[in-house]
Swiss-Prot record:
Gene that specifies this protein: MACROH2A1
PTM sites of type N6-lactoyllysine: K7, K9
Species assigned in the record: Homo sapiens (Human)
Places the protein is found: Nucleus; Chromosome
Bias (Basic residues) ranges: 144-160
Name of the protein this chain belongs to: Core histone macro-H2A.1
UniProt modified residues of type N6,N6-dimethyllysine: K123
Region (Disordered): 128-180
Residues modified as N6-methyllysine: K18
Length: 369
């Protein structure tokens, strides 16, 4: 009761407040009824619609904020919203036909156009190291007749090997140069922002890139396959640099990355990363985070090239196919969200034929996506 005996006015609670959402439920109901006058609309339909729209908006804003942060901007713009949608697979499928005003476009450069610009026809030519020049033999120096059959056999083997390399490489790729003399680039893919991914058959300790990635554990263990190779090439100086980094950095957390100088190696830096173990909680998400942290460190150093082994598929137990898919997804996602990366070339340094086949196959799918 009021002071004069009248009834106290009751504040009207909106449908949105009753449902616990911010978006206007009443307006949603009007929109639904406007388009479907013949049908009965349930009470929960506009509430559910408002809740879904509210969730999608919050998700897009969070991803757009991350894109703005990566670009070192203090304000979210339509461009960042476009990048947020493009960076998320589900949102990209949902909003595929939606145009975001003032958002710009994501360039989609076909490999054929890039190939024409370079003066080639867009076909892959696997680079095979030419054999050393043979010395001219005098007429008196002739091989015995009995050894001719062996020579033919060797020629057949070399031809067969070259054919296998050509088949392994994807047909719509182009190759330009190698990370080091004497190594074979089996396949190359160009991302839409110009970065190149190359599958290389070589020894990672001999790769001439700005940085090589060393999968390790919490204590910077260098006894793994890649660590042993780097230790043999880098020697005592490399080991001392790793020990100094361990003292300075402390334990390396899962998905973390730290950088040391590449003493005794063709690479300027070595990026040590602690990849997750297959079967652990959120192991797939953590492997993607590991790759992105390695790329972020390379960007901090303004490096132009980085060489990855097959992270996670060794002692950590990831299936090779799964590891390749996650690594390629993380790299593609990183370049989409960063936009201003100094990295121009990413090498996948592999040795066994199974890993090579998997990476060539998965890289070929990037164009389709």
């Amino acid at each position: 009761m009021s002071s004069r005996g009248g009834k106290k006015k009751s504040t009207k609670t909106s449908r949105s407040a009753k449902a616990g959402v911010i978006f206007p439920v009443g307006r949603m109901l009007r929109y639904i009824k406007k388009g479907h006058p013949k049908y009965r609309i349930g009470v929960g339909a506009p509430v559910y619609m408002a809740a879904v729209l509210e969730y999608l908006t919050a998700e897009i804003l969070e991803l757009a904020g991350n894109a703005a942060r990566d670009n070192k901007k203090g304000r979210v713009t339509p461009r960042h919203i476009l990048l947020a949608v493009a960076n998320d697979e589900e949102l990209n499928q949902l909003l595929k036909g939606v145009t975001i005003a003032s958002g710009g476009v994501l360039p989609n450069i076909h490999p054929e156009l890039l190939a024409k610009k370079r003066g080639s026809k867009g076909k892959l030519e696997a680079i095979i190291t030419p054999p050393p020049a043979k010395k001219a033999k005098s007429p008196s120096q002739k091989k015995p007749v009995s050894k001719k059959a062996g020579g033919k056999k060797g020629a057949r083997k070399s031809k067969k090997k070259q054919g296998e390399v050509s088949k392994a490489a994807s047909a719509d790729s182009t190759t330009e140069g190698t990370p080091a003399d004497g190594f074979t680039v089996l396949s190359t893919k160009s991302l839409f922002l110009g970065q190149k991914l190359q599958v290389v058959q070589a020894d990672i300790a001999s790769i001439d890139s700005d940085a090589v990635v060393h999968p390790t554990n919490t204590d910077f263990y260098i006894g793994g396959e890649v660590g042993n190779t780097l230790e043999k090439k880098g020697g005592k100086e490399f080991v001392e640099a790793v020990l100094e980094l361990r003292k300075k950095n402390g334990p390396l957390e899962v998905a973390g990355a730290a950088v040391s100088a590449g003493h005794g190696l063709p690479a300027k830096f070595v990026i040590h990363c602690n990849s997750p173990v297959w079967g652990a909680d959120k192991c797939e998400e953590l492997l993607e985070k590991t790759v992105k942290n390695c790329l972020a460190l390379a960007d901090d150093k303004k490096l132009k090239s980085i060489a990855f082994p097959s992270i996670g598929s060794g002692r950590n137990g990831f299936p090779k196919q799964t590891a390749a898919q996650l690594i390629l997804k993380a790299i593609s996602s990183y370049f989409v969200s960063t936009m201003s990366s100094s990295i121009k070339t990413v090498y996948f340094v592999l040795f066994d034929s199974e890993s090579i086949g998997i990476y060539v196959q998965e890289m070929a799918k990037l164009d389709a996506n």
